[in-house]
């Protein structure tokens, strides 16, 4: 074999290895992408009670899993690469197993890093997310039927979820009892989503960053105390 053939064979092997590596990485990327899409479709991932804001949480969490072990209801899971969250961090899916709102909040009390606020005194102060009625068109109560399951299952009934009466314009004779979520009381436990009788729940618990807007600091409301009458 001539000397000139050796470099050519080396280049061919190099290019072949590059193509194989690129193909392998692309396949892994596609697989992870599909897994993440499946994970998102199966339900929204929520953080445990007492979790600090998401960016700080991902940095503070040491992935020890103690909160998962402390949960007596197997609500909490640890995220994988396919979960759409930082791997090793705790989460739960309300449609699968909602938070049972333990009074002693064991998951937060064992957190060693501060990712979960151990100083939280009442589970009623937790804000794991916010229940949002995402599908009024299919909600049975909005159709004029009496369902009320989400309302009756809510651990803060008549506080976090109330039923508001509205005249049924379709019949002209009856009232509709419309479930209404109050963000100042909702803990985001997810029990309402869990018990929704529809194939896909009409009410879902979303992270606060998705469920609520954010008011700019330049807005002032004159009717609120401390604004000196300015609007």
UniProtKB/Swiss-Prot annotation:
Residues 1-41 form the signal peptide. Its cofactor is [4Fe-4S] cluster. Keywords: 4Fe-4S, Electron transport, Iron, Iron-sulfur, Metal-binding, Periplasm, Repeat, Signal, Transport. GO terms for cellular component: periplasmic space; plasma membrane. Its main location: periplasm. [4Fe-4S] cluster 1 binds at residues 61, 64, 67, 71. Binds 4 [4Fe-4S] cluster. One of its GO terms (molecular function) is 4 iron, 4 sulfur cluster binding. PANTHER family: DIMETHYLSULFOXIDE REDUCTASE CHAIN B, OXIDOREDUCTASE. This is Ferredoxin-type protein NapG. It comes from Escherichia coli (strain K12). The gene is napG.
């Amino acid at each position: 074999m001539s000397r000139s053939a050796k470099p050519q064979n080396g280049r061919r092997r190099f290019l072949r290895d590059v193509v194989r590596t690129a193909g392998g990485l692309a396949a892994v990327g596609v697989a992870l992408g599909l897994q993440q899409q499946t994970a998102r479709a199966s339900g929204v991932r929520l953080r445990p009670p007492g979790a600090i804001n998401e960016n700080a949480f991902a940095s503070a969490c040491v992935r020890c899993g103690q909160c998962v072990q402390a949960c007596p209801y197997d609500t909490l899971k640890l995220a994988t690469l396919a979960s759409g969250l930082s791997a090793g961090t705790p989460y739960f899916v309300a449609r699968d197993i909602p938070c049972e709102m333990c009074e002693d909040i064991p998951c937060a009390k064992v957190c060693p890093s501060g990712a979960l606020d151990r100083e939280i005194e009442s589970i009623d102060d937790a804000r794991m997310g916010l229940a949002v009625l995402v599908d009024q068109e299919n909600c049975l109560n909005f159709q004029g039927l009496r369902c009320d399951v989400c309302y009756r299952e809510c651990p803060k009934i008549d506080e976090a979820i109330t039923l508001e009466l509205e005249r049924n314009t379709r019949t002209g004779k009856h009232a509709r009892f419309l479930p209404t979520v109050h963000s100042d009381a909702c803990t985001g436990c997810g029990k309402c989503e869990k018990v929704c009788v529809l194939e896909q729940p009409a009410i879902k618990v979303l992270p606060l960053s998705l469920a609520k807007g954010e008011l700019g600091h330049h807005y002032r409301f004159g009717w609120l105390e401390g604004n000196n009458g300015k609007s």
